[in-house]
Amino acid sequence: SIVNRKDYFNMLKVTLISARKNTSLRLICLYDGKIGDPVYNLLKDFKVEIIIHELPYKKELMEIYSHEWMETELGKDIEYSRIFGTFMRMEIPIIEKEDEYVLYTDMDIIFNDDILLKDLPHPAYLAAAPEFERDTKRMSYFNAGILVMNIQGMRIKYQQFVEMMKKRQRSTSGLFDQGYLNELCFNDMEILPIEYNWKPYWGINGNAKLIHFHGMKPCSNLEEAG
């Protein structure tokens, strides 16, 4: 798993430290790795609730994003474990049974302040911030690294996504799960204020609640940044 690499492992550790230090959030992780490996043990150390879950459509994804397709279209091959990991967020609506809303984040985040439900949008489906642009009025594509999900609403979108998987239908709105989410949800989404998905390349923002190391990671190289 890519998260077991030292640089990604350390990013996850920073995410967990900042979440525990600066928030009152209940931390939950969907996990498809080996029990007892370093990432699993780190999650346990920070008392994260671990839900063991395997994607039900791995075969479909491997056919949609074949090694040949990735080499031709992307100019590089990507580990399937990395792709499967990002698609885990699609599973949240069918796993969550208690809460109406869920805050999802990637593992390359700094929690700079507490996150309270009353301060967040309450979308019919999901709320997200822009991929690159800071001006939300010009947003043409959202970043899926931080999402506020309406669980009931996203169950509808999940069923639509499953139908696309059955048909081996690749998203026309972008790569991997973020492309599917934009295709299914962009016209129905609400705006998540950029303070909840602040990118370091935008500069310093003392009001940023969540800092997202989007693209270039600390200690990574240009090839890994995509």
Go through each PLM region and give its residues.
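A glycosyltransferase accessory/donor-loop signature
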Residues: 1-2, 7-14, 62-63, 151-226
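Short, solvent-exposed loop/turn segments at the edges of secondary structure
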Residues: 141-144, 206
